[in-house]
């Protein structure tokens, strides 16, 4: 089967989360194959190494694609005014999604 690049969505913390001490940003990659996928998180263009949890969903029987959820956890103070980027790469290509905290 030919490789398929993922569809990527980036979700900022919910309003409820912003009242707690820890916030999470979730990057979801859907409908990709094969599962040779890497996720890179950047905060203000600096690659993040910690606070990341990835979970891959097994292939769908319909089209043999995979889904992945990657969560970046931050303290509320860390989250205040930065830009956040999730870069997802597999053999079909790279997809980059980002948002700026100041714009939300």
Curated annotation (Swiss-Prot):
This chain was obtained from pooled immunoglobulin of homozygous b9 rabbits. Gene3D superfamilies: Immunoglobulins (2.60.40.10). Residues 6-100 form the Ig-like domain. Disulfide bonds join 27-86. The keyword Phosphoprotein does not apply. The keyword Disulfide bond applies. Coiled coil: none annotated. This is Ig kappa-b9 chain C region. Keywords: Disulfide bond, Immunoglobulin domain. It holds the Pfam family C1-set.
């Amino acid at each position: 089967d030919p490789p398929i690049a993922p569809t990527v969505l980036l979700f900022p913390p919910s309003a409820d989360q912003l009242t707690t001490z820890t916030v999470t940003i979730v990057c979801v990659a859907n409908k990709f194959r094969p599962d040779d996928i890497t996720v890179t998180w950047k905060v203000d263009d600096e690659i993040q190494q910690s606070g990341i949890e990835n979970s891959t969903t097994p292939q769908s029987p319909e089209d043999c694609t995979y889904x992945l959820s990657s969560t970046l956890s931050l303290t509320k103070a860390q989250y205040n005014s930065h830009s956040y980027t999730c870069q997802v790469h597999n053999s079909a290509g790279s997809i980059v999604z980002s948002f700026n905290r100041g714009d939300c």
